[in-house]
């Protein structure tokens, strides 16, 4: 989901340019890795994932005017109120996102895909983009 979210932020013209996957003996999957994506405007996303690491689901957007960070995205439980911090030079401001229920939203999205053909077509396109990114990751990381 790291690449899917980065693709959403960078836009559909983003390309995967580096990928590294690492395994641990005794497991049949890649346990951790990293990737770099870039869009046509030269905006870069650096991604890392790991199933053998301390749990994190962070995002940091770093630009010339400041930085936005959030320590809990995409997997927050129902009712959890995530925060984000805006940093400009050495000034920090922490704000809250409204509590949400990501699991319920995913079920509602699934139902909407079943009931609405336009939503379904849009979701197919998003899934195809994600499939292409995963295949490119495997190619760059030399995963069979």
Language model regions located:
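Contiguous beta-strand/loop segments that form the cofactor/metal-binding neighborhood of enzyme cores
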Residues: 2-76, 107-118
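A general structural signal for well-ordered alpha-helical segments in protein cores
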Residues: 2-3, 81, 104-108, 134-135
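Ser/Thr- (and often Asn-) enriched beta-sheet segments in non-cytosolic proteins
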Residues: 15, 81-85, 94
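Aromatic-acidic/polar surface patches that form glycan- and anion
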Residues: 28, 99-103, 120-127
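Short acidic, glycine-rich loop/turn motifs
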Residues: 37-41, 84-91
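C-terminal helix-rich "cap/oligomerization" subdomain common to oxidoreductases
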Residues: 40, 109-144
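Short polybasic amphipathic segments
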Residues: 59, 77-89
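Active-site loop of classical SDR/Rossmann-like NAD(P)-dependent oxidoreductases
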Residues: 78, 94-108
